[in-house]
């Protein structure tokens, strides 16, 4: 089966290098469609697609469409984009990214992972369990899965696992058999207009599940718990540390660099219960334990054996830019993380404290003026688990500056709320020297943000080595999130 006849002609993706667009393009290419696209920059995703034989134009202009018969766009593409304007002038079908993803999903039974945070990691964990169970899933993710070296793969099995992006509301179109909701926080309000409208969208996402499917929902999160009460006539499986959770983690601890916990599994319908003891997850942090519970909830609905679940979680290779170890210098371990929302930052810093015997040093590049402005108080309160905070200039992402939403304003806000060690970063070139002056052996440095800070993080071990001291590079497989065993705090 295919979502559309192979003879529909050339499919052109505008912004093909985006993490969501690239995954769909890769799967369609592997299905046998003629795929091409354009992007503004020659990114790692673009290079990967070119390596598969997909034609990618750098720069966007009308002539790039050539013989294209269909174009696919994401919400990031503006109405005045020259390729979109050319497609409309030629009366070509214009397909939204979520619509094309939905067409792919109709071919299989699907797990769709939604939520403000944790979608990418949870998608990867579900995929890992289905892989270990021999189900050979098709996967389209919002991040690079280290085990695949890509964010997408075409499997031969009956199941598909996809990340459901809520940013533009189109996730309500996705036909999921099993839907996960990890959490719901105020985000993307520029699209929704209000938090209530965003919550209504998540309700629609869950109610799209068919009568034979299920919604797997985090009862620990107050907004998700409230949403559970609004869902009618759909099977619900809850997870969390809450005593009422159907999939409940207890006795959580850190052992040899692993998150270790017991899982009590209760069937709400029959009342039967069982327990998985000593589950080992190769990731730090309570938030990742919760993500793994969501994946366990899916696995129990699919009847996957406990030994397969255990093996998948213990051997999980992680996701790029999710607490990724990039190297060390003078016994200072350096990590790169995508966290850019206050809830994500707080969760990453909690995980960092559990992963080190020394201090935690956070380097943050705020992402978008609007986000910093709208969540300023939350940003000023989310760094409590960092012993030192280094604040860079805001990554603009095409936005214009907003008064009071700046590097210096955040530095002042953190200090005003009692943080004892906050520094402003003059520029990326100043970071190595500042880290060298601040960090001590045994400390952990984590670079946080959705912008260019990932390049600073990956260059930091080499840049520090040039200043003197011993560097240790991350192993090729070290994109695993499992950190070095902790010997001190929190045992």
Curated annotation (Swiss-Prot):
Swiss-Prot/TrEMBL catalytic activity: UDP-N-acetyl-alpha-D-muramate + L-alanine + ATP = UDP-N-acetyl-alpha-D-muramoyl-L-alanine + ADP + phosphate + H(+)
Pathway connected to this protein: Cell wall biogenesis; peptidoglycan biosynthesis
InterPro entries assigned: Mur-like_cat_sf, Mur_ligase_C, Mur_ligase_C_dom_sf, Mur_ligase_cen, Mur_ligase_N, MurCDEF_pg_biosynth, UDP-N-AcMur_Ala_ligase_MurC
Pfam families documented for this protein: Mur_ligase (PF01225), Mur_ligase_C (PF02875), Mur_ligase_M (PF08245)
Source organism superkingdom: Bacteria
Keyword Ligase on entry: yes
EC number: 6.3.2.8
Swiss-Prot/TrEMBL GO biological process terms: cell division; cell wall organization; peptidoglycan biosynthetic process; regulation of cell shape
Enzyme class: ligase
GO molecular function list: ATP binding; UDP-N-acetylmuramate-L-alanine ligase activity
Compartments in which it is found: Cytoplasm
GO cellular component, one term: cytoplasm
Residues annotated as transmembrane: none
Key words, A-Z: ATP-binding, Cell cycle, Cell division, Cell shape, Cell wall biogenesis/degradation, Cytoplasm, Ligase, Nucleotide-binding, Peptidoglycan synthesis
SUPFAM superfamilies with a match to the protein in the record: MurCD N-terminal domain, MurD-like peptide ligases, catalytic domain, MurD-like peptide ligases, peptide-binding domain
Binding site for ATP: 115-121
Described function: Cell wall formation.
Family: Belongs to the MurCDEF family.
Protein name: UDP-N-acetylmuramate--L-alanine ligase
Provenance organism: Parvibaculum lavamentivorans (strain DS-1 / DSM 13023 / NCIMB 13966)
């Amino acid at each position: 089966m295919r979502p559309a006849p192979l003879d529909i002609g050339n499919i052109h993706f505008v912004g093909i290098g985006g993490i969501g667009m690239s995954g769909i393009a890769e799967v369609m290419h592997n299905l046998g469609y003629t795929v091409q696209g354009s992007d503004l920059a020659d990114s790692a995703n673009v290079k990967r697609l070119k390596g598969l034989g997909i034609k990618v134009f750098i720069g966007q202009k009308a002539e790039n469409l050539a013989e294209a018969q269909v174009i696919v766009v994401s919400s990031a593409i503006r109405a005045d984009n020259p390729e979109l304007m050319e497609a409309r002038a030629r009366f070509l079908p214009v397909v939204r990214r979520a619509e094309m993803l939905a067409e792919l999903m109709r071919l299989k039974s699907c797990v769709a992972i939604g939520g403000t945070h944790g979608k990418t990691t949870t998608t990867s964990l579900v995929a890992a369990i289905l892989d270990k169970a021999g189900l050979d899933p098709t996967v389209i993710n919002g991040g690079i899965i280290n085990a695949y070296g890509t964010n997408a793969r075409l499997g031969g099995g009956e199941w598909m696992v996809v990340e459901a992006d809520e940013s533009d509301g189109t996730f309500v179109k996705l036909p999921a058999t099993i839907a996960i909701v990890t959490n719901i926080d105020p985000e993307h309000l520029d699209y929704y207009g209000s938090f209530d409208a965003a919550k209504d969208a998540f309700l629609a996402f869950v109610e799209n599940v068919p009568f034979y499917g299920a919604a797997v929902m985090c009862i620990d999160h107050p907004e998700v718990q409230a949403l559970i009460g609004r869902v009618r006539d759909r099977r619900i499986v809850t997870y969390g540390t809450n005593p009422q959770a159907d999939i409940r983690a207890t006795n959580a601890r850190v052992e040899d660099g692993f998150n270790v916990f017991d899982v009590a599994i209760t069937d709400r319908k029959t009342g039967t219960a069982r327990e998985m003891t000593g589950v080992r997850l190769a990731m730090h942090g309570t938030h990742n334990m919760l993500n793994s519970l969501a994946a366990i909830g899916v696995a129990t609905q699919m009847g996957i054996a406990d030994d397969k679940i255990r093996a998948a979680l213990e051997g999980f290779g992680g996701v790029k830019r999710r607490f990724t170890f990039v190297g060390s210098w003078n016994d200072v371990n350096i990590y790169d993380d995508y966290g850019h929302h206050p809830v994500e930052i707080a969760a990453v810093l909690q995980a960092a404290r559990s992963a080190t015997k020394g201090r935690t040093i956070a380097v943050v590049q705020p992402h978008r003026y609007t986000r910093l402005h709208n969540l300023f108080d939350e940003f000023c309160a989310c760094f409590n688990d960092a012993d030192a905070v280094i604040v860079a200039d805001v990554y603009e992402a095409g936005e214009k500056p907003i008064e009071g939403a700046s590097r210096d304003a955040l530095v002042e806000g953190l200090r005003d709320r009692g943080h004892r060690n906050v520094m402003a970063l003059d520029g990326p070139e100043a970071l190595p020297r500042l880290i060298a002056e601040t960090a001590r052996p045994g400390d952990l440095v984590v670079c946080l943000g959705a912008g260019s800070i990932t390049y600073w993080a990956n260059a930091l071990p080499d840049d520090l080595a040039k200043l003197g001291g011993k560097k240790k590079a991350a192993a090729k497989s070290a994109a695993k999130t499992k950190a070095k065993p902790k010997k001190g705090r929190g045992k």
